[in-house]
């Protein structure tokens, strides 16, 4: 068995944390079929989980919401969601808000392509027989009102979004459910 990959935020400067909750997923617990990919031999529903957060800094300009699998056998992990420019007044995403046609997203928010090459949430799909993978859901409180004002749009990659998050995150909330089959 190989060692577990580190979490991506282990390599970034520490920032304060705040509270992240969900009615659909839980820290350290197995995700349901609702959050599993529909494809790659999987028959899940590919629905983004409900997420809500509180306790972030008052000076937050906007949020970014990401989901990353550090255990994917790619050498670089796997991005399942990169949602940018969630307004600072929004503290919850409903179940399915970042799925399908994205009609549940707040005004101004946008997704960049995930590693399935889709501008939406892409569910879990670890290889059969792998130990359960970790899915790092993160809500990043940012010091700018929008990343679009910094030149980002829906055409950037998750890596470019992450590069910008590195320099604008003032606090971060994490929840890490797992999935394996």
List each language-model region with its residue ranges.
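N-terminus-centered regions that define maturation/targeting leaders and the start
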Residues: 1-181
